[in-house]
Curated annotation (Swiss-Prot):
The modification Phosphoserine is found at S280, S286, S296, S301, S317, S345, S463, S467, S468. There is a cross-link at K132, K436 (Glycyl lysine isopeptide (Lys-Gly) (interchain with G-Cter in ubiquitin)). Belongs to the protein kinase superfamily. CAMK Ser/Thr protein kinase family. NIM1 subfamily. The autoinhibitory region (AIR) inhibits the activity of the kinase domain. It comes from Mus musculus (Mouse). This is Serine/threonine-protein kinase Chk1. Residues 9-265 form the Protein kinase domain. Residues 391-476 are annotated as: Autoinhibitory region. It comes from the Eukaryota.
Length: 476
């Protein structure tokens, strides 16, 4: 069942987990507005409380159509809540077919939107420092949104730019200068990461484990061995652009203004029917008004613009996926109650509400948590009941050598390692829908493409029991 959170708001499902907490989907039971709520346990984040304050402060600065909106924050005891846009289109990695990629026209469109978001961030002096498909979300109109500013920092203030020295990010996406333990400029680092994202979109795989001479794939790239994977799968025009982006020397790396002049970047590609677009401004009228209201009532700490950055922080995981929905159909007062609500109640195991068949009623029911289900391809119906489906999953996990445990209700947590020997954790929910069992996979920690590879492997092993019925989500 849905868990009451603030007046008229319920927590209906977990969107993701991180080192210090999780992200929950909150839905207004009257208006059906949806907001992502990042819940941080400050007791678990005791070693880096300033990082949380910094993340809040940076989020407050942001307002762009290709950046996840921030509605406000609230502290209750040792729990910090951040209220963010809910993106029902899911993560970009879900649109990338392992070892194949996506249609070139889709990759170009997403890359355009990624560039627009990064140009905006750099324009206000912010560098993201962890650009990767797991941190790029899609709204209900398939517009790309940059999310997760936990590693972001200010590199320019009052027209004065500072060099950075903190090594952070996700190794396959970081620029080579980060690994040299010297100071570096911020903007070329984000540009490099965007090039790796473009490679993943076009080829369905990452080019290397890390950009260092100890990595054979990276050495091959520097020696221009483009007859190897992933480069041989990429057409000559986008490959020419990647040759200009993935340049080891930062000063020789192409800048975003020059990327926008590139032949492939400006090449008209057949996109078919044009998708409807969100409003061209950064914030919708109602959410902008809401934003002004909460900003005048909430206390934000200033950004620390000091030049020293002492920690080494690399991520092989998927941080909390922030997701978003626009609130222009209703006034700000409903979300205002969510941000400034007095009574918060925390579920001990929030995902139990996903497996209660009584909630899965008629379409349009505000009590149906699947009304706001994130769109993703990693789910299927089975021909069996819940018990038999669970038994088949168990047998498959044992054959594949996975570690697994049953957690909340009909949920299983699976742990394994990917091809790079990094930890990969995903959760599987068995949900009764229309007298059928939906098996829903969600990445909890690790690389998105590797997660999809394992999903396809499991689905292949279960081919005899997988139903041919399509899963159409999200329901709107």
């Amino acid at each position: 069942m849905a868990v009451p959170f603030v007046e008229d708001w319920d927590l209906v499902q977990t969107l993701g987990e991180g080192a210090y907490g999780e992200v929950q989907l909150a839905v207004n039971r009257i208006t059906e507005e949806a907001v992502a709520v990042k819940i941080v346990d400050m007791k678990r984040a005791i070693d880096c409380p300033e990082n949380i304050k910094k993340e809040i402060c940076i989020n407050k600065m942001l307002s762009h159509e290709n950046v996840v909106k921030f509605y406000g924050h609230r502290r209750e005891g040792h729990i910090q809540y951040l209220f963010l846009e809910y993106c029902s289109g899911g993560e970009l990695f879900d649109r990338i077919e392992p070892d194949i990629g996506m249609p070139e026209q889709d990759a170009q469109r997403f890359f355009h939107q990624l560039m627009a978001g990064v140009v905006y961030l750099h324009g206000i002096g912010i560098t993201h420092r962890d650009i990767k498909p797991e941190n790029l979300l899609l709204d209900e109109r398939d517009n790309l949104k940059i999310s997760d500013f936990g590693l972001a920092t200010v590199f320019r203030h009052n027209n004065r730019e500072r060099l950075l020295n903190k090594m952070c990010g996700t190794l396959p996406y970081v620029a080579p200068e980060l690994l040299k333990r010297k100071e570096f400029h911020a903007e070329p680092v984000d540009v490099w990461s965007c090039g790796i994202v473009l490679t993943a979109m076009l080829a369905g795989e990452l080019p290397w484990d890390q950009p260092s001479d100890s990595c054979q794939e990276y050495s091959d790239w520097k020696e221009k061995k483009t007859y190897l994977n992933p480069w041989k799968k990429i057409d000559s025009a986008p490959l020419a652009l990647l040759h200009k982006i993935l340049v080891e020397t930062p000063s020789a790396r192409i800048t975003i203004p020059d990327i926008k002049k590139d032949r492939w970047y400006n090449k008209p590609l057949n996109r078919g029917a044009k998708r409807p677009r969100a409003t061209s401004g950064g914030m919708s009228e109602s959410s902008s008004g809401f934003s002004k209201h909460i900003h005048s009532n909430l206390d934000f700490s200033p950004v620390n613009n000091g030049s020293s950055e002492e920690t080494v922080k690399f991520s092989s995981s998927q941080p909390e996926p922030r997701t978003g929905l626009s609130l222009w159909d209703t006034g700000p007062s409903n979300v205002d109650k969510l941000v400034q609500g007095i009574s918060f109640s925390q579920p001990t195991c929030p995902e139990h509400m996903l497996v209660n068949s009584q909630l899965l009623g008629t379409p349009g029911s505000s009590q149906n948590p699947w009304q706001r289900l994130v769109k993703r391809m990693t789910r299927f119906f089975t021909k069996l009941d819940a018990d038999k489906s669970y038994q088949c999953l168990k047998e498959t996990f044992e054959k594949l050598g996975y570690q697994w445990k049953k957690s909340c209700m009909n949920q299983v947590t699976v742990s394994t390692t990917d091809r790079r020997n990094n930890k990969l954790i995903f959760k599987i929910n068995l949900v009764e829908m229309d007298e059928k069992i939906l098996v829903d996979f969600r990445l909890s920690k690790g690389d998105g493409l590797e997660f999809k590879r394992h999903f396809l492997k499991i689905k292949g092993k279960l081919s005899d029991v997988v139903s041919s019925q399509k899963v159409w989500f999200p329901v709107t």
